Amino acid sequence: MASGQQERSQLDRKAREGETVVPGGTGGKSLEAHDNLAEGRSRGGQTRREQMGEEGYSEMGRKGGLSTNDESGGERAAREGIDIDESKFKTKS
């Protein structure tokens, strides 16, 4: 049990130094903050998927995956002739 507490203390110290110690916890100033941020981001994505439906959520991800530092996903899709069905982005009523 003491080693678990020691490990959490080390992770907390690293988080306070600005290192990301939990996937999705970027920006937290402590281990607890990292945990909370990661959980909130995960829950937010799940909620969005429920609102849009699996198909719309996947289509939105396709568009986002096309984005670069120079242009948005929509601009790149138009330039390359990739069809993105934005009607699927609508939330379910």
Swiss-Prot record:
Residues 9-19, 31-52, 73-93 have a biased composition (Basic and acidic residues). One of its GO terms (cellular component) is cytosol. GO terms for biological process: response to abscisic acid. Pfam families: LEA_5 (PF00477). It comes from the Eukaryota. Residues 1-93 are annotated as: Disordered. InterPro entries: LEA_5 (IPR038956), Sm_Hydphi_plant_seed_CS (IPR022377), Small_hydrophilic_seed_prot (IPR000389). Belongs to the small hydrophilic plant seed protein family. Lea proteins are late embryonic proteins abundant in higher plant seed embryos. It may have a role in desiccation tolerance by acting as an osmoprotective protein or as a desiccation-damage repair protein. This is Late embryogenesis abundant protein B19.1B. It comes from Hordeum vulgare.
